Structure formats: structure tokens, C-alpha cells
Amino acid sequence: MSVLPFLRIYAPLNAVLAAPGLLAVAALTIPDMSGRSRLALAALLAVIWGAYLLQLAATLLKRRAGVVRDRTPKIAIDVLAVLVPLAAFLLDGSPDWSLYCAVWLLKPLRDSTFFPVLGRVLANEARNLIGVTTLFGVVLFAVALAAYVIERDIQPEKFGSIPQAMWWAVVTLSTTGYGDTIPQSFAGRVLAGAVMMSGIGIFGLWAGILATGFYQEVRRGDFVRNWQLVAAVPLFQKLGPAVLVEIVRALRARTVPAGAVICRIGEPGDRMFFVVEGSVSVATPNPVELGPGAFFGEMALISGEPRSATVSAATTVSLLSLHSADFQMLCSSSPEIAEIFRKTALERRGAAASA
């Protein structure tokens, strides 16, 4: 029996298997654990290691067959998950060999889409992040210097040098404040208050830069996906890039579960829809099913008449909607859009009449 189907079953279980494995690694560090319990935990680690070995074999076979390509990071994680514990078991005779199974921390990240996004965010925001980090370093040294000057005679054992004062500066800038080092003078306490406020501002800058970067990355991905969808719609294929950008910016995402009614016949319509994923069923005398790239509901925007058919989700469907207010703005700024919609409405009305 081929092991190739195993990968499809196993891939979602990376985190599920890693969790008990890492808990077993932690439990094996308890000094007074009985020998039987240690043996059971070691057996559990061996079972998980065997599962990871099968996954590695499946991945390599799929890659050799050409089914999977460009998965070097995933394969590297699979190789490390197998070889590192094996090498530790064979070469390290001490009970600490199980600690090397901590490499399984990488397994839940194997199929994650978060870290590629994080990498792009860090690359895009590198200049701003480096700038804030530089500011942090400057403030850190300045605070340590000030604390050294103010407190060195009062607490020479804690502020007797700038490196010693830097520990207090770090924990105070991060607003952690362990309490092991506290300024005794009035000037030192005023400095501590100012440093805490500065730390909040600096960490707020870091958080704001990363949050903005993630938001822009998600928006960029949505924009590209929506652009590809809109550009593939025959209705818009003759429009220029500038007009397409306006349309994409006006679209709003919506997900509808299977069987749900999207619009009913006779209802007033205030938007049209584009199908991104899934399919919808149009209840006409000759029922029609529309898939990705199709659109419906444009008649209500053009003529203002009620819905001419009931449309429901044949499967779970992702839609992009264009509201009437946005539609009117687009038509006023780009008359060619209004003309394209008008011609399409006439064609569909004629086709419906002939049917």
C-alpha cells in the first residue's frame, strides 16, 4: 500500500502529535519519576518519532514523483524532526537525549501560513523597525548613564557602573520593573517615571508598526485576489487598470453558508455579487448554477427593478458585493462602466425573454 495518502491524513495532526511529545519531554525532566513512567514516556516519544518518519517518507516520495514541489522549508523541518532525536538517542547515552525532541516545536509551524506573512511584514517594515530599535538603544544608554550619575553614590552595588545601571534601564523601559533595583533619590524616581512612560511609547511604536504591516499585507492579498477575480469577469475585460482599481476598492467580502438564500425574487436590490469561491444556484425556469468568476444581481443596480430570480448558495460560497451607492459613484466617475452594465443587462433581459 502506498504511503502517499498518509500525508493528506497526517498533515493536520502535526500540532496534535507535537503537543503530547513536548509534554513528555517536560515530564521526563522530573527527578523523582518512576522508571516505569519514564519507560512509558520514552515509548510515547518513539511512537511519535515513527509517525514523523512516515511523514518524511511520504513527503520525499511525493517530491520524487513530482506531486509536490518547492517545499524545501517543510522538508527541512521533517528531516530535523527525525534526525535530531535519532542522533541524540544514538550518540548521547545520558537521559537528556529526550531534550532533543524539543525540535518538534517546529512541527506545528510546518503548514502555517502565518510565518511567510510575518517574514514579508518584517521585510517591508524593516526600515521603521530598525529606526525604533535604534531609538530604543539610544534611550537605553542615556537612561543608564543618567541613573549611574544620580544613584552611583547612593547604591554603588547596583548603580556602580553603566553596565550595572543598564539592567535597571532595561526592566524599567519594558515597564516590567522586577523590584530588585529601585532608585532611592528623588531625582532617580523622577527619572524612573519618565523612563516608564518612554518605554510605553517605544513599545507602542513597535506594536503599531507591526499591526500596520500585517493589516497592509492582508489588504494587499485581498486586493490581488479581488483584482484577479474582477479582471477575469468578461464584463470588465475591456476596462483599463485605473477603472479596475476603483472597482476593486469598492468591493466588499461576504461568506454565505450552503443552502442560504442570497436574494429573493421580488425583493428590492441594493447590490450585485461576484462569486469568488463555491457556486450559487439561480432559480429560473431553467435553473442555472454560477461558479467562480460569475456575477449576478446587476439588473437591480441598473434599472432599479426588483430581483428577477431567487439566488441561493449551492455550496459555501465567498462573494464580493458591489453596493448601489458605490456603483453610482463608479458610473459617475467612469461612464464606460455604466455603459458596460447597461449593455449586459439588455443582453441578459433579451436572453431571458427568448427562453
Curated annotation (Swiss-Prot):
Q: Which domain of life is it from?
A: Bacteria
Stretches within the membrane that do not traverse it: 162-180
| Localization in the cell | Cell membrane
Q: Residues that bind 3',5'-cyclic AMP, according to the entry?
A: 297-298, 307-308, 348
Annotated keywords: cAMP, cAMP-binding, Cell membrane, Ion channel, Ion transport, Ligand-gated ion channel, Membrane, Nucleotide-binding, Potassium, Potassium channel, Potassium transport, Transmembrane, Transmembrane helix, Transport
Effect of mutating residue 348 to A: Loss of cAMP binding. Loss of channel activity
Q: Name one Pfam family in it.
A: cNMP_binding
Short sequence motif Selectivity filter: positions: 175-180
Is-annotated flag, keyword Nucleotide-binding?
yes
According to Swiss-Prot or TrEMBL, what is its membrane topology? Answer: Multi-pass membrane protein
Q: Which CDD domains match?
A: CAP_ED (cd00038)
According to the UniProt entry, its GO molecular function terms are: cAMP binding; identical protein binding; intracellularly cyclic nucleotide-activated monoatomic cation channel activity; potassium channel activity; protein-containing complex binding
Please give an example of a GO cellular component term from this record. Answer: plasma membrane
Periplasmic compartment residues: 31-38, 151-161, 181-185
The record, for InterPro entries, names: CNG_cation_channel, cNMP-bd_CS, cNMP-bd_dom, cNMP-bd_dom_sf, Ion_trans_dom, Nucleotide_channel_N, RmlC-like_jellyroll
Which sequence ranges are listed under topological domain Cytoplasmic?
1-12, 62-74, 113-129, 211-355
How this chain assembles, per its entry, is:
Homotetramer.
Give the UniProt family note. Belongs to the potassium channel family.
Function description: Cyclic nucleotide-regulated potassium channel activated by cAMP.
The name under which this protein is listed is: Cyclic nucleotide-gated potassium channel mll3241
User: Which species does this protein come from?
Assistant: Mesorhizobium japonicum (strain LMG 29417 / CECT 9101 / MAFF 303099) (Mesorhizobium loti (strain MAFF 303099))
